[in-house]
Amino acid sequence: MPGWDSYRAVYGAEVRAAAREFLDHGWPVVEKSADTLMLITGSALDVLEVPAAIGRGICAQLRAADIVVPVAATPTGSWWYPVTPGSALPAGLREAEDVVLHAGDAIAAPPSQVPDGWVHWRVPPAACDFGVAAADLIFSAAATAVALRVDDDGHPGAQRPAGVVAVGMRS
């Protein structure tokens, strides 16, 4: 396919630039391949991975408190949040489906290509000077998002307590 090699070269340069930027800000990464970066968790940061519905709830709470943190999204429908390392996942979140704390392992970091598509930033770390959110802040927001039923009608961040009907509400 004409142009494919030039595309791969440009994308490879983008991945290498992202790796340098992560490393310059103390985020440990390794190149898994020419188009995949792995963020190493457990020392400088851990990563909380949640389903997108919970991620929208977390973002809504953070937005309401005017807090900006990095957020990545995967093509399989999960979002992840870099958090301060060393905290254990609270019991309520350990029991929640598809909530995973990555500590001491590796996770594909933007702009990585994975089998189902691309991992990308919803909020890039540069938007908050590569700050890592306090684990307890994100865990608390995640616990609240799990406890609330997230609106599935296409309104990102819209949420309401289970059993409450929202009429004419817009987030």
Residue ranges and their predicted role:
Residues D98-A143:
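Conserved catalytic-core surface of thiol
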Residues G42, P51, T84, H102-G104, ...:
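Structured loops at beta-to-helix junctions and adjacent beta-edge loops in soluble globular domains
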Residues M1-T76, P85-S87, P124-S171:
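Signature for HUH/AEP ssDNA processing cores
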Residues V83-D105:
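Helical (often loop-to-helix) elements that flank the catalytic cores of nucleotide-handling enzymes
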